[in-house]
A protein has these predicted regions:
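Juxtamembrane intracellular "pre-TM" segments in multi-pass secondary transporters
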Residues: 1-5, 202-234
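Extracytoplasmic gate region of multi-pass secondary transporters
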Residues: 29-30, 227-279
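Conserved MFS/SLC helix-loop-helix module at the cytosolic interface between two early adjacent transmembrane helices
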Residues: 65-104
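Cytoplasmic membrane-interface "Motif A"-like loop-to-helix N-cap segments
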Residues: 75-87, 287-301
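Cytoplasmic helix-loop-helix junction between adjacent transmembrane helices
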Residues: 110-148
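Glycine-rich segments within core transmembrane alpha-helices of 12-TM secondary carriers
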Residues: 139-165, 363-376
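C-terminal transmembrane helical hairpin of 12-TM major facilitator-type secondary transporters
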Residues: 292-345
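A late C-terminal transmembrane helix in Major Facilitator Superfamily
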Residues: 350-385
Length: 403
């Protein structure tokens, strides 16, 4: 008989924690890219491709290579092996990044290690929910996992500027990066240890009758690509996740484009706050009403005004404060809808592609979003962000087409 065990909440908690620190490490410098360039001055060419923004882009580059191998490990050997591999690498590389924070090269190498670990965690969201949660709770479990990712990004966006010298008008501008990265490093290491100790593969009996996959990894991919709804989901993630990855990675540059001198991280922070609220509400409603499609449509339509406001804020006023306020409000709206679509899309994809392995369908969605995110960030950051405004306009157009 299917049974839901209380230990499922322990599993979800440790999975959420490892997601939090993974996202902190991803964007630790994204909101403070300009003062970080001062801290690492002389260690890289600011006008080259290998700059501060490249640290966030590493995650996307490596994900394209490691996503399918990670999904294969999770599908073949289980979530305990897959997530444990990721957690061990996250703990070691996160701590090394903090200990060797003064060396830009060392930070880049540690970031590569963190990027290798990323798909072993991100691709396991639906696998964790299916192995441990009954069908009626899976949208909520996926939503809470996404919520943890957003909390991690929010910490990176909001807390980091307070831990370093981020105001160019202050004498300590560009300092404090060593202690900040070391603090994040020890936090990451501690969470990784807890994850390794508490993680379990599956409960003694399945939580639902459909909890066991029937397809192998290769069969699952072929089955997934035959599903029309899955092909639509791949397109939506191709656009939506790509935009989210690009905006998250370039948040400080977007703030500069809006005329904001202080690297306060609020544009990215409010997008994350909106995403946290959305991920707390819409997946729960989706579970309650047993509907996925209608809420996905709401998310796609709702992101349009947010993207337009963020792109064309400067067209509404010449006052910097007003432009910044419009950018902040638009960022919140964009985050609420675009970030709620993630957990809904993952769970919907797992359901329409059953009995294909869940981590395979999720890995494919993440893969296409990382691909476009990489392309977008590369285009936005080239020649000292020369094409940033044009890229934002393209995002606005793509959001309308998707809706």
């Amino acid at each position: 008989m299917p049974k839901a065990y209380p230990y499922r909440w322990v599993i979800l908690l440790v999975f959420m924690l490892i997601n939090v620190v993974l996202q902190i490490q991803w964007l630790a410098l994204a909101a403070v890219a300009r003062p970080a360039a001062v801290f690492y001055q002389g260690q890289f060419d600011p006008s080259s491709f290998l700059n501060i923004d490249f640290l966030a882009m590493i995650y996307m580059v490596v994900f394209l290579v490691m996503s399918f191998p990670a999904s294969y490990v999770i599908d073949t050997y289980g979530i305990r092996v897959g997530i444990s591999l990721g957690a061990a690498l996250i703990g070691v590389c996160g701590l090394l990044k903090g200990v060797l924070a003064k060396s830009f090269l060392a930070v880049v190498i540690a970031q590569v290690g963190l990027a290798v670990a990323q798909p072993f965690v991100l691709n396991a969201v639906t696998a964790v929910s299916v192995r441990w949660f009954p069908l009626r709770e899976r949208g909520t479990a996926a939503g809470l996992s996404a919520l943890a990712q957003y909390v991690g990004i929010l910490i990176a966006m909001i807390a980091t500027p307070f831990m370093v010298g981020s105001d160019p008008a202050e004498p300590g501008y560009g300092t404090g990066f060593g202690p900040m990265l070391l603090t994040y490093g020890w936090l990451t290491f501690g969470v990784a240890v807890v994850t390794l100790l508490l993680l379990r593969e599956r409960p003694p009996t399945p939580p639902s009758a459909d909890s066991r996959e029937k397809h192998s990894f290769g069969e699952g991919i072929r089955h997934i690509l035959k599903q029309r709804d899955m092909r639509i989901m791949l397109y939506l993630f191709f656009v939506g996740l790509g935009i989210f990855n690009a905006v998250s990675s370039m948040t400080d540059s977007i703030a500069a484009n809006a005329g904001v001198e202080d690297s306060d991280g609020l544009i990215g922070g409010l997008m994350l706050i909106g995403g946290i609220l959305g991920a707390s509400i819409l997946p729960v409603l989706s579970d309650r009403f047993r509907k996925r499609k209608v809420f996905l449509v709401i998310c796609v339509v709702g992101m349009v005004p947010g993207m337009f406001g963020l792109t064309y804020a400067g067209s509404f006023s010449t006052d910097v404060a007003t432009v910044y306020a419009i950018s902040l409000a638009s960022s919140f709206v964009l985050g609420f809808f675009i970030m709620s679509a993630g957990p809904l899309g993952f769970q919907y994809a797992a359901e329409v592609t059953h009995p294909a392995p869940e981590s395979t369908s999720q890995g494919m969605l993440l893969w296409v979003g990382q691909l476009t995110g990489l392309i977008f960030v590369a285009f936005m950051s080239v020649e000292s962000n020369r094409y940033l405004s044009a890229s934002l306009s393209a995002f606005a157009f793509l959001s309308v087409v998707s809706a």
